[in-house]
């Protein structure tokens, strides 16, 4: 679901060409296979304490929607980072596409690093993997990072003005505000 929200739906919102969409799907497939490999290897070996730590962490990143019908899995994004996303929209509307492309790429690269931290590195640190599982997990994280960075670096420069604006607007729509959680 996270891949669909962050990558696939973003690509659909930008109305990418079939060739560019194929690259997006290949990247998602690589990340998905890598993630399943890491989860498949580690889940079988987790003890009760590790399972409890994983469940507690998942509860921290789960936020109820205002309608109460569903939940979001989300991580905090700084105000400066939110402003950078909004600035991309402004640059697009002012016709400064080259600068908007650079800003969108920078925004997405930072967002990727944050997502990897929240969705991979923090949970792995909680689980206290041994050396073999830690190595498998680290390879998975770096594969995900490289695939994501490659997609951003290759895709953003090719976006036309309308695609660029649509992509920035989609990214902005992903920025949600949640009330503080209490247990």
Model-derived features with residue positions:
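Protein-protein interaction and targeting regions used for scaffolding, dimerization, and localization
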Residues: 1-183
């Amino acid at each position: 679901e996270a891949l669909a929200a962050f990558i696939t739906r973003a690509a659909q919102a930008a109305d990418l060409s079939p060739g560019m969409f194929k690259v997006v799907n290949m990247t998602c497939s690589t990340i998905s296979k890598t993630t399943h490999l890491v989860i498949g290897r580690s889940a079988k070996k987790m003890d009760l304490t590790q399972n409890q730590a994983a469940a507690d962490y998942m509860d921290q990143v789960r936020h109820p929607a205002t309608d109460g019908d569903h939940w979001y899995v989300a991580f905090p994004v700084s105000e400066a980072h939110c402003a950078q996303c909004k600035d991309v929209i402004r640059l697009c509307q002012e016709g400064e596409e080259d600068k908007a492309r650079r800003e969108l790429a920078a925004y997405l690269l930072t967002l990727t690093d944050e997502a990897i931290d929240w969705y991979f590195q923090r949970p792995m640190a909680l689980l206290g993997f041994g050396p073999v599982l830690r190595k498998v997990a680290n390879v998975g994280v770096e594969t995900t990072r490289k695939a994501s960075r490659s997609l951003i670096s290759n895709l953003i420069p090719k976006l036309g003005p309308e695609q660029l604006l649509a992509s920035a607007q989609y990214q902005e729509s992903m920025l949600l505000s949640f009330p503080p959680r209490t247990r």
